[in-house]
């Protein structure tokens, strides 16, 4: 990792910091009472943070207060830091299994004393009192690995008058003078500190229960385009750009094949040697045209290629792909559909995008370049473009083509995706959305690579337009209730 310059800081002795420390020491005995007063708001906050942060993660919370949030996230290793000794004392008494440290998070010497890396670094309502946000972010790189997510949570500047009124009527605990940030300000600050915002979400339209109306508003009304910009809370998920390369060297290309006999040899001949160690796994799906026999023949003709073959245990593309992923040896996992409508010659672009750290989940897109005549029917094209807009909104990450078969991610990230699959369940027979939704939930950096979609030269398509459309409608409803409307 490149060296990070950390100039000395004397912010912990500034009058501003002393005022913050004193205020929070005074508020510490009453902290739990204030939490109970705003119990609904804090439960809404926690709901989304639990979605972002899997239980069992290694979590560092900067500005932890009395530790209630850190404990609720159920970390395997939890470290909380706060400038207030009063808050830290209460946290230690209440949650003895977690680690709580009193310190100034703007002090590079203190940050240097922490032992990382962590899976998640959480900065919750702390930006507003920092003297130098950019330098604070910069100091955190040494606590990050490639997979670490920095999550920054803050109040919308649009709500400042309402929050001030809540203080005056004693619905919110007293606050020190606050910096006020727009979403663009936060994105610029993390970028200046060599972090990259990979996902941004707005939530909570009502901080009050209102006899259940608040829950309805937050779940179903707050996500709506236009309304969303009025929400109280901003959540920005970032990754370190100084730790984006973790040394990948090998790849597995998984080729699910059902009734694709005429494409098997061409797949082997056309997959370039884009890295030193390429494993090709054909997964045969109960074909009727001799595909399995052709795979065996091709393996014997090209012994110099590392080709493996397996018959899928169940049915459907998802079953085939995940069966191969479970036995794959490569650092990077790639899906190449056996119809070769995504030209295998494009695979080096996908490899370079993930090897260089430009992306962590690489998705092909058929809908940017002109495609060959008859490669996709007009109604399919219109539907795909419409659904790409919907899924971009649902996932808060840009997608132009969710059903391109070529998808690439690290094997280590697939293992995390697999471990968290119980959240979504067995819902997708094709596997496209299983991977996309899992990557989005993990906060992976998504990069799309345009490909020139070619028409099929052998066999027939495995899916009808009607089934294709029904699948997309099902996935929209599923994503809304499992990702957007929590």
Q: For each predicted feature, which ranges?
A:
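Acceptor/aglycone-binding surface of glycosyltransferases and processive sugar-polymer synthases
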Residues: 159-174, 179, 310-327, 344-425, ...
């Amino acid at each position: 990792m490149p060296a990070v310059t950390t100039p000395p800081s004397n912010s912990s002795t500034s009058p501003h910091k002393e005022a913050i420390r004193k205020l929070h020491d005074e508020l510490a005995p009453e902290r739990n009472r204030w939490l109970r007063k705003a119990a609904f708001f804090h439960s809404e906050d926690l709901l989304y943070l639990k979605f972002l942060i899997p239980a069992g993660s290694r979590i560092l919370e900067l500005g932890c207060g009395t530790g209630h949030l850190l404990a609720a996230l159920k970390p395997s290793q939890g470290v909380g830091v706060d400038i207030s000794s009063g808050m830290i004392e209460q946290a230690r008494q209440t949650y003895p299994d977690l680690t709580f440290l009193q310190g100034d998070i703007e002090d590079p010497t203190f940050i240097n004393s922490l032992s990382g890396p962590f899976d998640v670094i959480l900065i919750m309502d702390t930006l507003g009192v920092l003297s130098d946000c950019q330098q604070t972010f910069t100091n955190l790189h040494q606590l990050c690995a490639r997979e670490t997510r920095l999550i920054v949570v803050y109040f919308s500047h649009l709500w400042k008058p309402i929050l001030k009124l809540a203080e005056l009527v004693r619905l919110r605990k007293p606050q020190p003078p606050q910096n006020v940030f727009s979403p663009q300000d936060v994105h610029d600050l993390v970028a200046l500190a060599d972090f990259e915002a990979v996902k941004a979400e707005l939530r909570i339209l009502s901080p009050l229960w209102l006899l259940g109306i608040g829950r309805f508003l937050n779940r179903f009304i707050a996500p709506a385009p236009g309304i969303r910009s009025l929400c109280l809370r901003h959540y920005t998920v970032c990754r370190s750009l100084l730790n984006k390369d973790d040394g990948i060297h090998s790849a597995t290309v998984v080729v699910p094949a059902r009734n694709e006999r005429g494409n098997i040899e061409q797949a082997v001949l056309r997959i370039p040697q884009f890295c030193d160690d390429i494993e090709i796994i054909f997964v045969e799906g109960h074909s009727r045209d001799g595909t399995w026999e052709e795979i065996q023949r091709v393996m014997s003709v090209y012994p110099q290629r590392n080709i493996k073959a397996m018959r899928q245990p169940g049915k459907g593309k998802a079953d085939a792909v995940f069966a191969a992923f479970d036995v794959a040896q490569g650092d990077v996992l790639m899906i190449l559909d056996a119809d070769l409508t995504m030209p295998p010659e494009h695979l080096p672009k996908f490899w370079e995008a993930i090897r260089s750290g430009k992306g962590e989940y690489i998705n092909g897109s058929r809908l940017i370049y002109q495609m060959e005549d008859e490669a996709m029917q007009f109604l399919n094209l219109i539907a795909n473009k419409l659904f790409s807009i919907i899924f971009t909104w649902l996932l808060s990450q840009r997608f132009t083509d969710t059903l391109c078969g070529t998808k690439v991610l690290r094997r280590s990230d697939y293992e995390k995706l697999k471990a968290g699959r119980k959240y979504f369940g067995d819902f997708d027979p094709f596997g496209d959305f299983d991977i996309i939704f899992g990557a989005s939930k993990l906060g992976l950096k998504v990069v799309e690579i345009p490909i020139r979609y070619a028409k099929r030269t052998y066999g027939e398509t495995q899916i009808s337009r009607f089934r294709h459309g029904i699948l997309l409608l099902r996935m929209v409803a599923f994503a809304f209730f499992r990702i957007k409307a929590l």
